Each structure stands twice: as structure tokens, then as C-alpha cells.
UniProtKB/Swiss-Prot annotation:
GO terms for biological process: glycine betaine transport. Keywords: Cell inner membrane, Cell membrane, Membrane, Transmembrane, Transmembrane helix, Transport. Belongs to the drug/metabolite transporter (DMT) superfamily. Small multidrug resistance (SMR) (TC 2.A.7.1) family. MdtJ subfamily. One of its GO terms (cellular component) is plasma membrane. The chain crosses the membrane at residues 1-21, 31-51, 54-74, 81-101. It is a multi-pass membrane protein. This is Spermidine export protein MdtJ. InterPro entries: Small_drug/metabolite_transptr, Small_multidrug_res, Spermidine_export_MdtJ. GO terms for molecular function: amino-acid betaine transmembrane transporter activity; antiporter activity; choline transmembrane transporter activity; spermidine transmembrane transporter activity.
Length: 120
């Protein structure tokens, strides 16, 4: 459970960092760029700890996929960016992919004592 919390923190900091990049580009001052640097750095740190127990492919897909989903939603709400039918279809496809990746991931089972291993 702890590693999933780290992954959630990685996703949240990635979203914050990316949105602050946009905020900095439309505003004045360096605060947005500093916030971006800190948040994206934290995002990678959290992600690197999360992949200790979460499969890399799953963690990365969730990190990037959920990040893109929320960045798009917040970009529409905060920066008045357009959300076309094609973008909506892409986001729905992304969500379906995230669900399939997560549901297709098996937890490693306990090794059976005395189980034979196949040799080639």
C-alpha cells in the first residue's frame, strides 16, 4: 500500500509540475519555473521509490496516463484550452488502456515449497 501512495504522490507532483510550466509561460516571474523544477524532481523521486514494489510498466503507464488525463482536464478548466471530440476519444482510449494494464497485472504468488523448475 505504501508504494501505491508513493505512486499517487508521483502522479500528483507530475501534474502540478506540468501545470506550473504552463502557468509560468503565460505569467510573469520565475515562481512557476521554480515550482515546476521542484515538482517534477519530486515526481521522479517518488516514482523511483514506487517501482521498488510496483512493476515498472504498470507504474509508468499509470504515472503517465493518469497524469495526461488530469493535465488535460485542468488545462481546459484553468487555461481555457480546447477539448475536441478527438481529444475526448483519445482520453477515453487512454483510460481504457490504464484499466486493461492494471487489471492484467498479476500479483506474484508465494513460491510452492519443493516445486520443480523447468529446465531447458
Amino acid at each position: 500500500m505504501f508504494y501505491w501512495i508513493l505512486l499517487a504522490l508521483a502522479i500528483a507532483t507530475e501534474i502540478t509540475g506540468t501545470l506550473s510550466m504552463k502557468w509560468a509561460s503565460v505569467g510573469n516571474g520565475n515562481a512557476g519555473f521554480i515550482l515546476m523544477l521542484v515538482m517534477i524532481t519530486l515526481s521522479y523521486i517518488f516514482l523511483s521509490f514506487a517501482v521498488k514494489k510496483i512493476a515498472l510498466g504498470v507504474a509508468y503507464a499509470l504515472w503517465e496516463g493518469i497524469g495526461i488525463l488530469f493535465i488535460t482536464i485542468f488545462s481546459v478548466l484553468l487555461f481555457d484550452e480546447a477539448l475536441s471530440t478527438m481529444k475526448i476519444a483519445g482520453l477515453l482510449t487512454l483510460v481504457a488502456g490504464i484499466v486493461l494494464i492494471k487489471s492484467g497485472t498479476r500479483k506474484p504468488g508465494k513460491p510452492v515449497k519443493g516445486a520443480a523448475r523447468a529446465t531447458i
